[in-house]
């Protein structure tokens, strides 16, 4: 079944849809922007890209759909864990998408998603407030 036909079926009646604040969001896997649109849908396309946080809380996991074996959902995804510094992680995601000519329209969305995940994994440094000495009169 073509992606366009699947989109016509799924676009208004999917278990992943969330409609609130006059906008429609989607919680499906491999939807990089969580937006209910044809381009970012993670279920209907033959090639999809997903970026998730790693299980141990350090790094990201890039999920890509295989071209072959589309009828076998258990083996249709390739998961690659990237546990490097931020610049190397974003660079390797960029190369995975660009060098393989794999959905170039999703490149920037995948990089931004990975950047947000890496930023959230950074430890937060608590700044101590400076207290002024009390005035004695």
From Swiss-Prot:
There is a cross-link at residues 58, 65 (Glycyl lysine isopeptide (Lys-Gly) (interchain with G-Cter in SUMO2)). Gene3D superfamilies: 3.30.390.110. GO terms for biological process: cytoplasmic translation; translation at postsynapse; translation at presynapse. The keyword Ubl conjugation applies. Keywords: Acetylation, Cytoplasm, Isopeptide bond, Phosphoprotein, Ribonucleoprotein, Ribosomal protein, Ubl conjugation. Pfam families: Ribosomal_L28e. Disulfide bonds: none annotated. The keyword Acetylation applies. It comes from the Eukaryota. GO terms for molecular function: structural constituent of ribosome. The modification N-acetylserine is found at residue 2. The modification Phosphoserine is found at residue 115. It is found in: Cytoplasm. One of its GO terms (cellular component) is cytosolic large ribosomal subunit. Component of the large ribosomal subunit. Belongs to the eukaryotic ribosomal protein eL28 family. Component of the large ribosomal subunit. The ribosome is a large ribonucleoprotein complex responsible for the synthesis of proteins in the cell. This is Large ribosomal subunit protein eL28. It comes from Mus musculus. The gene is Rpl28.
């Amino acid at each position: 079944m073509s992606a366009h036909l699947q989109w016509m079926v799924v676009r208004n009646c999917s278990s992943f849809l969330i409609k609130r604040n006059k906008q429609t969001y989607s919680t499906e896997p491999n939807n990089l922007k969580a937006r209910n649109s044809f381009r970012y849908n993670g279920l209907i396309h033959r090639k999809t890209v997903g970026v998730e946080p790693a299980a141990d809380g350090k790094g990201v996991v890039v999920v890509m759909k295989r071209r072959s074996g589309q009828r076998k959902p258990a083996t249709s995804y390739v998961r690659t864990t990237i546990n490097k510094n931020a610049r190397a992680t974003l660079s390797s995601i960029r190369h995975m998408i660009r060098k393989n000519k794999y959905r170039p329209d999703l490149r920037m969305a995948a990089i931004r998603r990975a950047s947000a995940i890496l930023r959230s994994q950074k430890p937060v440094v608590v700044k101590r407030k400076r207290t002024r000495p009390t005035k004695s009169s």
